[in-house]
């Protein structure tokens, strides 16, 4: 048990003095919290929806007007704590509210506490005068109805609910329940009380995990209407591409392991459900290192997905000039090292390939008005006469 404030000077140990001060501060905090709870029960006593919750405490308010903190009151104090029920609420014999809860203020005479930095000297903690505020609101009580009963019509219902719940919590939409209430002035008002589900929803809940699908919109040529220069298509990016041992080896930079797997029968051009290969995904990520490794291991650059889109179409659509130069440069190198003239057609086939709409990368670039990309394709010999059917 902590010593009185006048005996703190006898405690020479700083840790013991600090513990004693903390105990007094905690006792004062509990005292204030109990006062606030009693005040809330008094305000809501005449509300029909809450009569059951506080009905058992009516007798204490009417017949036993004593401080709720008698056990914490300093016995040496000349002025004991005032009775909360005598200051806050007065009732007729019928139990009707006759004093407006907002017309009074309550002064909390806190116990004497000590300042830790004062070296053991005690200082009085004066709380001053406080009125019902946001700091003691209970989220499970309908404070909208309480404020309306008290005559506070300056704030709207959403604002009052914001006070009760706080800015960080959400209120689930529930059908409100209307209840009639008779105020002290005799006027009948209709208040909105929360449903049980709404009361439960006022408590803070952890956020739920959401699954997000990333969608990118790109402008591509509109072949159906010659008056429009472009159209927008939605390309949904899968959360993760399919993985194979070969691709794992490439991702780790172990091309010797990848070659061993390929020589053992591994297919480097395995398609997924959309017809895309590892090369398609590497190009879409602008992963030049993986693209170069896949091409060196024999990936087919001319393979298209279910929509007829090749890796070059994908790079042109993304306006990835470096990737386009990498793909076309690799095709040009393949043609230079080809043994016969018949096999020197890789660049031509790649740059003039058509997608599902019979569009070449050059045609796609023209419709999307990408001048720099168009110059790159022309430098590599793209055919300007190939059109759509």
Curated annotation (Swiss-Prot):
Disulfide bonds: none annotated. Disruption phenotype: Leads to the loss of apicidin F production. It is found in: Nucleus. Keywords: ANK repeat, DNA-binding, Nucleus, Repeat, Transcription, Transcription regulation. The keyword Nucleus applies. One of its GO terms (molecular function) is DNA binding. Residues 1-27, 65-84, 219-239 are annotated as: Disordered. Apicidin F, like the other known apicidins, is a cyclic tetrapeptides with anti-malarial properties via histone deacetylase inhibitory activity. Pfam families: Ank (PF00023), Ank_2 (PF12796). Residues 1-13, 75-84 have a biased composition (Polar residues). Residues 12-38 are annotated as: Basic DNA-binding region. GO terms for cellular component: nucleus. Its main location: nucleus. ANK repeats lie at residues 241-270, 274-303, 307-336, 357-386. It comes from the Eukaryota. Transcription factor that regulates the expression of the gene cluster that mediates the biosynthesis of apicidin F. Binds to the eight-base-pair motif 5'-TGACGTGA-3' called the 'Api-box' that is found in all promoters of the apicidin F cluster except in the promoter region of apf2 itself. Belongs to the bZIP family. Highly divergent. Contains a basic DNA-binding region at the N-terminus which is usually found in bZIP transcription factors, but does not contain the characteristic leucine zipper domain. Instead, four C-terminal ankyrin repeats were identified that were shown to confer protein-protein interaction of regulatory proteins. PANTHER family: ANKYRIN REPEAT DOMAIN-CONTAINING PROTEIN 39-RELATED. This is Apicidin F cluster transcription factor apf2. The lineage of its organism: Eukaryota, Fungi, Dikarya, Ascomycota, Pezizomycotina. The gene is apf2.
